[in-house]
Regions:
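Short alpha-helical oligomerization interface
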Residues: 113-131, 174-176
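NAD(P)H-dependent oxidoreductase Rossmann-fold/reductase module
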Residues: 1-79, 95, 170-335
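Glycine-rich NAD(P)-binding loop of the Rossmann-fold in SDR/ketoreductase-type enzymes
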Residues: 84, 126-134, 185
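Active-site loop of short-chain dehydrogenase/reductase
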Residues: 103, 146-167, 202-204
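Amphipathic alpha-helical dimer-interface segment in Rossmann-like NAD(P)H-dependent oxidoreductases
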Residues: 132-150, 195-199
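A glycine-rich helix->loop->beta "capping" turn
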Residues: 71-77, 94-108, 114-119
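Rossmann-fold scaffold of SDR-type NAD(P)-dependent oxidoreductases
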Residues: 27, 100-111, 156-159, 207-211
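The beta1-alpha1 cofactor-binding region of Rossmann-like NAD(H)/NADP(H)-dependent oxidoreductases
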Residues: 80-91
């Protein structure tokens, strides 16, 4: 367990230990976890350049003003976009590619609490579009920029790391999966998608994390649908943590050497008194793809064994083929 005091102590020294001038993209960052993480990133880093994507210009203006107060040397650029649409994701990525030769950090937290299974204009289940398809598209489109960065290269996708569940291969989009199985299905899609991407980018580290129950509009909507105190994952609803604490925890995930890339110098530096490097999703230390829980630790042995079984069944390849087929259907281009 990485306790909050340890996280805060680590974050306090980012300004002196983390390279100055990091370039980052935060998707889904005009509210909730994304906004809190962007602000914490502005607070701790030196001369950051942070792009952030969302739908509300009003919210973005307030966030930019707050970030500029936190760090006057930073640059904060808002891109208004509906990233549930794959074609729009491509447009956003094209803007970043036109402006930047490299990217150090990609942070993905876009999501929506909808249980009526709406579909997008591109005929993808809205919840799945935000949780899986658009995130994988951002990663694959921006992977060359991440690989071009010197030193630190990391992707963090906020979801349900450690809670991977069975896949329904007849319903990858999760349009008809029972509600109680929906979460585990989508979480597995994300993790297996990251494993595929990582094979072609061993110099980039990939984290799929579970943020805990964070006090955000999305969380409150979910809890309200579940009748304010219904069981989640077989247990009682935990106390909500603040968005500010979540921001601190996620900046730690963005910068800590506990989660190194599989190859290269990336984060193989000294841990400086921190907890040790954790296990990747393949059960090996520091292997580059991490499914981690709220406490910053790797998934349980049972979950890692479950992922082994999925690999044996060829699920990594099946998830990727389905995802690429959807991209081709929508854009004419593979991931």
């Amino acid at each position: 367990m990485v306790a909050l005091p340890e996280i805060l102590a680590f974050n306090a020294q980012i300004h002196s230990s983390f390279p100055a001038g990091p370039v980052a993209l935060f998707v889904g960052a005009t509210s909730g976890i994304g906004a809190a993480t962007l602000k914490a990133f502005a607070k701790y880093t030196v001369k950051p350049k942070a792009y952030f994507v969302g739908r509300s210009q009003e919210a973005a203006d307030a966030i930019i003003a707050e970030c500029q107060t936190l760090n006057t040397e930073g640059e904060y650029i808002f891109i208004a976009a509906d990233v549930s649409l794959i074609k729009v994701v491509d447009e956003v990525c094209a803007q970043i590619q036109a402006r930047e030769p490299y990217l150090n950090i990609l942070f993905l937290s876009q999501g929506v609490a909808r249980f009526d299974r709406p579909v997008t204009a591109e005929n993808i289940h809205l919840v799945a579009a935000l949780a899986h398809y658009s995130r994988i598209r951002f990663i694959t489109r921006l992977l060359p920029l991440l690989q071009a960065a010197q030193g630190h290269r990391r992707v963090v996708t906020v979801g349900g790391g450690g809670f991977e569940g069975p896949l329904d291969t007849s319903d990858f989009q999760a349009l008809h999966i029972p509600l109680e199985k929906l979460r585990g299905h989508l979480i597995t899609l994300i993790t297996l998608g990251l494993e595929t991407v990582a094979k072609s980018a061993p110099e980039v580290s990939f984290i799929h994390d579970y943020p805990g129950a964070v006090d955000t509009p999305l969380t409150r909507t979910v809890l309200s649908v579940m009748n304010e105190g219904a069981a989640i994952d077989g247990g009682s609803v935990p106390d909500l943590i603040t968005a500010e604490e979540s921001g601190e925890r996620h900046v730690y995930l963005l910068t800590s050497p506990r989660y190194p890339a599989a190859e290269g110098v990336d984060d193989k530096a000294s841990l400086g008194g921190q907890s040790e490097v954790i296990l990747g999703t393949d059960g090996k230390v520091g292997s580059g793809v991490y499914s981690i829980g709220f406490e910053g630790e790797n998934a349980t042995p049972e979950t890692l064994d479950f992922l082994v079984g999925l690999r044996r069944e060829g699920m990594v390849e099946r998830v990727w083929k389905h995802t690429e087929d959807e991209f081709v259907r929508i854009t004419g281009e593979r991931a």
